[in-house]
Design a protein with these regions (language model features):
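A short, internal acetyl-CoA/4′-phosphopantetheine-binding micro-motif in the GNAT/acyltransferase core
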Residues: 83-84, 96-107, 136
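GNAT-family acyltransferases
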Residues: 1-96, 158-167
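Conserved GNAT acetyl-CoA-binding A-motif
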Residues: 124-134
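Short aromatic/hydrophobic contact patches that present stacked aromatics
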Residues: 3, 98, 132-134
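Conserved beta-strand edge residues that scaffold enzyme active sites
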Residues: 136-137, 160
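Conserved active-site alpha-helix within GNAT-family acetyltransferase domains
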Residues: 137-155
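Conserved acetyl-CoA-binding loop-helix of GNAT-fold acetyltransferases
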Residues: 98-101, 107-121, 143-148
């Protein structure tokens, strides 16, 4: 069964293995935790992410962000970064959701099914009547994922498509 679970201490070992298997920056998905030690993950990253998800100790111009791992039964297959509030930078850029699927689980529909779960999770909690997402133009698979979830291309620049999903 496929489900989302927020970053937590109970699953720290599996979360650590998953998050460190995702590259630092691949296809526009930035993973600032790719090279941390397990101790740093448990003692620093998880507590910091918990606080920041509640809006505590945010850096200037930052919004609360939640990390949801996508699980298929007892295996983590991906990671979704979710922002329920947007600032101007996010509204014009990355948007509400960023996601990455662990390489060995790609091309199995996990991104589409995970994105649908995230949309369902946040649709009643965001201020906008659309979900904002961006995608690198050189990542057609991610664009296809978004289109499969009802997205349309709202805007574009040289490097990115900016999509919207009506809710």
């Amino acid at each position: 069964m496929l489900f989302l679970k927020e970053m937590n201490f109970e699953d720290a070992k599996k979360e650590y293995i998953a998050i460190t298997s995702i590259p630092k920056d691949e296809n526009g998905f930035e993973n600032k935790f790719y090279n941390v030690s397990f101790e740093e993950f448990v003692n620093g990253i998880i507590p910091t992410c918990e606080k920041q998800s509640k809006g505590i100790d945010l850096k200037p111009n930052r919004v609360p962000q939640n990390y949801y791992f996508l699980w298929d039964d007892d295996e983590i297959v991906g990671l979704f970064k979710v922002r329920k509030k947007l600032n101007d930078s996010l509204r014009e850029g990355a948007g509400h959701i960023g996601y990455g699927i662990i390489k060995k689980y790609r091309n199995r529909g996990y991104a589409t099914r995970g994105l649908k779960l995230v949309i369902e999770l946040i649709k009643d909690e965001i201020e906008e009547d659309e979900i904002y997402i961006s995608v690198n133009k050189d990542n057609p698979y991610s664009l296809k994922t978004q289109l499969n979830c009802g997205a349309y291309i709202f805007n574009e620049n040289e490097d990115h498509y900016f999509t919207r999903i009506k809710i």
